[in-house]
Amino acid sequence: FARTLIQVHYHARMGGVSVVMSRYARAFEQLRGRGPGANIVVCSPDQVRQRLPWPSVTRVDLPECAYRAFRSGASFDRVRARLRRRLEEVCDDPGHAGPICVVGHNLTLGKNLALTAAFADVARERGDVNFVSVVHDLAEEGRIDMLRRLRSVERWEPGIRRLMYPTLPNYRYVVLNRRLHRLFGAAGLDTGLLFNPVASRVTPDGGWISRDRLWEALAVTARRDGVLLDRAKPVVFYPVRILGRKNVAEAVLVACLLGGANLLVGGPGSSARDRRFMERLLTLCVRRGLPALFDVERARRRLGRDVGGGRMFPHLYHFADVCISTAVTEGFGYALYEPWAYGKAVRGRVPAGFSFQGGIDGGGLYRVLPVPIEWIDAARLERNYYRYINECFPGQWDGATFEDFREAFERTVITKGLIDFAMLDQDGQLAVLDRLAAAGNVAEPRMVRRAWGGRVPAGPEDTFDDRGRIDRNRRRVLRNLSGAAFRRAFQRQVLRGRPSRHGHHVDTGVFMKYFHTVQQIRLLQASGTAVAPGRKGRKIPA
């Protein structure tokens, strides 16, 4: 199998894809052993030219890999040519012994379509090298900015969709979940299914930070925000960045209001929109006295070297009484798997289209958190969805009026006067959260039954789950989703994988057809700028 692994991504900032890249690199190093070869990551330097904290990895900084939109065909062609030339140079480096495997992460998402095109160009020219496109997410899931970029680039590169999904004898796709595996199969793309590796070594270098010391650091950080954490309450940890699709307002509702617990959450995403939402959510929590700490890794400054060389998340897993996940969509869903490795139960929501891998028992999670429709401005919500769906999927439907859409929307997503909290936009979610907090959460027992299975935590020692299930899931995560099991799957799907068929008919339109319905789309999946005014005369099916 491959002696040189070259991973290509937009950046190496903290996040889910970077975690996957680091664990791919570690697995490759363990499989390769000694001898010639190389372990390479190609990405933009971003703000900091830091040394990658991964074993035996050489970083190749290529600024053109960064996120970018293009205003002209000339700029697109110029960046594409530069990227193609640099990727060829990395492949041709005499120190990079063959066979070579080049892995592109999320290049179908559209965050830099010149990088996507250059990756396909080099794959077409270098038949002696294996290329693997690892797909974590799809633009078609409702990522408006990515869809806009794709439509813009199509004006001067009409074949960009074929470059996103080429069919070549040395080009293969790998996806992270069964839903994407089914969709790629329906599109006619030769695709492997490879779960993401879950951490198997749970004790950080230097051991665990003491509970008292960690609690003090968290409490001081929270007080600087105007938030008072309550040591008498359980601690719930949501190990994600604050992004729209992570549905963090629901985590506040479930943990702080319905569960009577403290909540710890990671920092905001990289967009101004994510940071603004975190600030609005924090303002509400301060005003209503909700014990939620956002951007929790700031507490690291008060712990110094005690954290060791890694992130705080392992210490927070160990510290928390229970973990939560409320995301509306997930590529893999580390927050639904990794807590079990630390002996902690996971509560919250099952993402749309999600199914657990590795034999994990996901009992205790809900699929819908009902909210009375009279609590929100339903007409405003319907118009926002109408604009959003038309912006994401223009031309998908024949003519109909907004009234037709409203009828389909109400028939599909409103049941007995209730709507799922995750169907709301962020404004609607904050309004509901504020209403419940102001009322002292006495108005809606149905939400408690959905969120916690009929009960709230009794105290800090309450695991919200039976110990038998926690132990079983911990064993299954460590046996099936990490270590040797992952290395075997990684070797089969990535390092040795080649297409079983290519050059056949491919129809990636199935992605649009699947995601353009009211059942699949969520306003929380929007990213970047506001939704443009919708177009009239579109028929939007239920």
Regions found by a protein language model. Name each.
Residues 328:
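Aromatic "clamp/platform" in nucleotide-sugar-dependent glycosyltransferases that forms part
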Residues 233, 275-316, 322, 361-375:
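Nucleotide-activated donor-binding/catalytic signature segment of Leloir-type glycosyltransferases, i.e.
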Residues 46-47, 179-180, 194-209, 511:
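Short beta-strand->alpha-helix junction loop in the catalytic core
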Residues 1-51, 97, 123-129, 484-491, ...:
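N-terminal subdomain of nucleotide-sugar transferases
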Residues 13-14, 31-83, 109, 271-272:
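N-terminal strand-loop element at the rim of the active site
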Residues 87-115, 129-134:
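Short N-terminal targeting/anchoring amphipathic segment
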Residues 121, 139, 149-172:
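Membrane-proximal helix-turn-helix segments that form the acceptor-binding/catalytic region
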Residues 6, 216-246, 252-255, 264-265, ...:
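Conserved donor-binding/catalytic core segment of Leloir-type glycosyltransferases
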